[in-house]
Each structure stands twice: as structure tokens, then as C-alpha cells.
Amino acid sequence: MIVFVRALGVEHLGEQPFADSIPWLPTGDTVFEIGVLVDPTGAAVLFFVSITIFMIFLYSVGYHNFGQPAGDHDRAGLPPHGATVEEHGHKHVVPSVEPMYSRFFAFIGLFAFGMYTLVVSDNLLTLYVGWEIMGLCSYLLIGFWYGKPSARAAAIKAFLTTRLGDVFMLLGIA
């Protein structure tokens, strides 16, 4: 945070933004490129996106009970029910770890990658790729507990809603 605030006071900071691109899909006379562009505005957004992603990861570790034992009756696709442990001769139920803990964090990590791609994109093609990655991950995260009918219905609703927006976005790009 200190570095960010100090960087705001530096003169000529945004005169040389970082930009790079690579040819991705050559089609005849046209070459589609994928690239990145980090200017002062993009750097500020990256800063806040990074803080947000860190907070999401930190919250998720506690929410999914990392470090707790596996539950006796937990099943993949459903929220954890709790684990029975014996301490000092007494049995009691404690929160149990999410059965698909690593899968959840893979989805969150991919969502973060899509968000970073969206922020640093230097053209509409790269922006669209980042947007689609985020849309896919939104569907996967909303329907993470797929054993619950309400989670499945919400995931499908979110998927269809974002696909409608994607069609119009793609038409606007074309």
C-alpha cells in the first residue's frame, strides 16, 4: 500500500506504459494478437483487484474449514455436515473440511486469472477471452455444491444470463 501511494506522487509515471503483444491467430492479411497493456489506470485497478482476490482467498480458507478433519457423512457436491471427533473421552461434532477443497480453489484461481486478463488486455479479443474465463468460473462457483437443486438452478440461470450478455458483447466487438 505504501509503495502504491508513493508511486502516485512520482512525476512522469504514466508516460511509458508497459505494453507487449504476440501474434496469436494469423488469418490471411490480418493477424489477431493477444497482448497486455499496463498504464497508470490499469496499475491502480490491478492493485485493487489483487487486494480483492487476496481477501477472497483468505475468507475462503476459513469458510471451507481448512485444517479440520473430514466429515463422516460428507459427500462431494454438498456442503460439509461436520466430523465427529473424540477428545478426552467425549465425542462431539466439529466443522469439517469441504470435500472438494482443492477444486474450489482451482476455480477461484482461474477466476482471478480471468480478472487479471480482463484488466491488462490491450485489445477487445483479449478482453473477451478474460470475460469468458470469468463467466465460466462464475458458473462453476455458483453451482459448486451441485448436489443442491437450488445451486444447480442458480448456476444455470447465471450461465444463461451471462451468455446473453456475451452474445451482445461479441456482436459489439464484430
Positions of predicted regions on the chain:
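...captures the hydrophobic TM-helix bundle architecture rather than a specific catalytic motif
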Residues: M1-A174
